[in-house]
Amino acid sequence: MEETLVDKKLDLIAKPIKMKNKQHSQITNMPYVKHILFVFLAMVLSPPASSQGKELTWEELREQYEFPEWYTEARFGIWVHWGAQTQPEQGGGWYARHLYMQDVGKQNWGKNAYSYHNKTYGHPSEKGFKDVIHEWKAENLDTDALLKYFKKLGAKYFVALANHHDHFDNFNSTYHPWNSVNVGPKRDIIGEFSESSKKYDIPFGVSSHDDRFLHWWLPAFGADTSGVMKGISYDGHMTTKDGVGKWWEGLDPADLYGLPPHKRTPEWIEKVKENWMLRHKELATKYDVDMLWFDGYGFPYDSYGKEVCRTFYNHNLRKTGKMSVVVAGKFKDEPLTVKDIERGGANKILLFPWQGTLTMRSWFYKTDEHRGFKHNARTVIEMMTDIISKNGNLLLNVELLPDGTVPPDHKVILDDIGAWVNLNSEAIYASKPWNIYGDNLNSYLKHSMEDMNEADLEALKKNATSEHFNERTLKDPSYGPDEVRFTTKGDLLYVFVLNPTEGVIALPLLGLKSKHKVKKVNSIRLIGSNDNISFEQSAHRLILNVPAKRQNKYTAVFEVKGAL
């Protein structure tokens, strides 16, 4: 059980106080000592300042904060990167931006957006992203069913997208009219997910990607550079007057797209930042979220983002008497935050909690022909294994369909992942890293050298030592059959054989003379089986037999007793 602040203070009181001299010791006989002790107890046992109404500063929060166990022990969470940009079947994850670009340049993931939009919705001078939002109904969204399913898969926390770069809020925002209650689904999506998370006792987080708003929408103020519509302004230039008699009457496109570039004054930009802050303070407090996750390499809008986080922590402290929430993002050595690594993982064991985010295909669900699966159950499980061996959590995106349901072909993969997680749960949840995360590291490179040119090999080596976007996909060579990862729990060591094949593997790090001070192994068991596994331990290696018959075809996990 987690030691509370009160427990620590009581422990402090219970310890004997060493007096410097006899004169000091005589005060214990004085009548007023009871009064002093009473005051002292009142001080140390009083709740944190924020729970009494005083807002703690960032520095004061740093002194008190500890990462909550629900997060550090979770190891596996599920995220739905789902919003209005899912509505178009094609066009990539930046559809709202790319629909206004005849030429997307190097951003080739959005190359179909402009043509698809013209064919499906009309020309962006009349029908822009505002009209895509209007078409999005989320008609089959059942948040209870989704949370029940995600919990069955073994997810220990859940995250929903609150807004994307498109500046559209998936919650009932007091400060932003372009939200899912006013437009599109006419539902408080975050509110529904929040209630279902509580119902199924799963910590709930929200992701925000809106701090790119100021530059992300600039193409909406352009026009075609060629063709019959050349020079006709896109709908970013529309005003409230243009909406009279239309479905969006009363709404101002400028609240969604921003002002045209030539009208953006420093004062207006400050108002945008202040509005962002108000929206996100409301998001964090109204829905009592357990995690705020920002898609950026620092606090959104600097001090504004930091103030949102300060409010978030204080709200949690005031309501529960402790800080049990998490702020995550692509931070670098930022106290009170979890480091997030997009589509990849750390290249070493990190001392503090972190998470790797992954998706099987694209972030938003798309059917573009050039967008096949990057991952299947095998590669996701391998990524999860690598991440938890380095003290991280895997946050896996589930690409919901526009109607709010899980695509059937994705469900097949998710079911396989869930079966593996549930089978090997003892080696996953609440596990800790060992002295080193793995053995026979990058042995696959030895097997790849015969079939790959020098440039490809160098790219693989670089990928193995990077972080963001270092994911190993279906296109990459498989792990060598002897490459393993480690986790621990108590006095047990768990060995994850990433790409198991029948036969023996040698693990040098588990020899009796290993620099990691390995003890004599007593027994080895394949999780999912009651049969002991044959092995041989010498001074320089542990030889482990991987059986052909296993309950699951993916990464094989062995419980090793005695080594630690």
Where are these regions (language model features)?
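Short linear, low-complexity motifs centered on an aromatic residue
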Residues: 1-6, 95
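Short, positively charged and aromatic/hydrophobic N-terminal segments
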Residues: 15-18
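Bacterial N-terminal signal peptides that target proteins for export
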Residues: 20-37
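Sec-dependent N-terminal signal peptides
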Residues: 36-44
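N-terminal signal peptide c-region/cleavage motif recognized by signal peptidases
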Residues: 46-48
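Mature catalytic domains of secreted/periplasmic carbohydrate-active enzymes
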Residues: 52-564
